[in-house]
């Protein structure tokens, strides 16, 4: 990988906040260094628990995972630590730990999630997905980065804050560790409504994002929204012999392939009419992604052209993107000479900031139904909608975070958009309109979150803990949220 400085990432002003001027930054670094091996070992213990919030996986593992997280938080001296929801209620187990503010100090909410994505084929991993391994300066394993690293970053930052400032720092801290984020947070709105007072805060940190490059401290300032859908195409009502009926009758996979092909134009840009596409906008307009570096980061094969129009950052952050993430048809190994009557696909549509997700879902449905190949039956089921997100970087808590990131990495921090989605940010914005919501994280282009061989860059992780601990200390010294 090239030096991150070659990516032309402009520095962000990192003026020391007045309420942080007296902090001994080196004391925080030293405290993190003392704790770091222990933190990584504890992270490895969390990685070993295969807590997956999908229906086909064992829910008992999620309970184990929540109990392990609760035990870590109890050890840090929180006044209350509870696993929610209670038995018999809907939703997979989350953990809420709270210590109230004292002396008029603000309260912060630290979010992460303990559930993980399925590992895929374990044999495809270099090492077992649920056995954390250190290798080449990284920690490998499912959830090592997304998002059990976020869980342990919160635990470690709270630990370091207490070690350096003492237990009477006065900052109100609530840690909320969700248990079904990778399943789309289906119960988040209801959970938030039931626990609104418990989760109330002046500033919120969502530790579930990434850095621009290894070695570049980053605050994510915008996210695309999301629409998830399943489309099924059917041409006949039963299986047919491919020799006896092939020709006049097209099989389900062919019909579906033709329908999917209408979703992009000849340049590879999304062709769903009416979707907002900010081709000329790069978010904050500052970061530029070198195409050679992008191809290396993404593993694009030689000779394969990149899709879409406009700058790479606009294609990643401010334009829609549509991917086929699942496809059901007869498997190659069990196929016979028959015409399959139907096929279906799962679609993931990322929508630009400013696009209403309900409208985007309607536009996607209308496109699919109006482009039915050869008049085939097309059924569309919308399974998920989530709005885009943008944060106010002029807020004091945001300025504190940009400063803390710069100090932790000893280099200027940057702001970036992200093509992914965290749908519940809109719920948090609605519930707590005065709170600054800050999206941080420790993934990088080599992390492969959700993929085979997920990993965490350990030195950046060390710095991320320093940054969060410094931010907490700055918040403790502030009279404002």
State where each predicted segment sits.
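Acidic-enriched catalytic cores of C-N bond-cleaving enzymes acting on peptides and small amides
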Residues: 242-327, 355-377
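Short beta-strand/turn micro-motifs at beta-sheet edges
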Residues: 217-221, 332-337
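Zn-dependent metallopeptidase/amidohydrolase metal-coordination segment
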Residues: 232-234, 256, 339-343, 396, ...
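A short beta-alpha structural unit
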Residues: 350-352, 379-394
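Active-site metal-coordination/substrate-binding segment of hydrolases
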Residues: 105-177, 463
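N-terminal helical capping/dimerization or prosegment-like subdomains
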Residues: 2-122, 342, 346, 359
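Short, solvent-exposed beta-strand/turn "edge" segments of beta-rich domains on protein surfaces
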Residues: 248-249, 334-341
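Histidine/acidic-residue-rich, glycine-tolerant segments that coordinate divalent metal ions
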Residues: 169-251
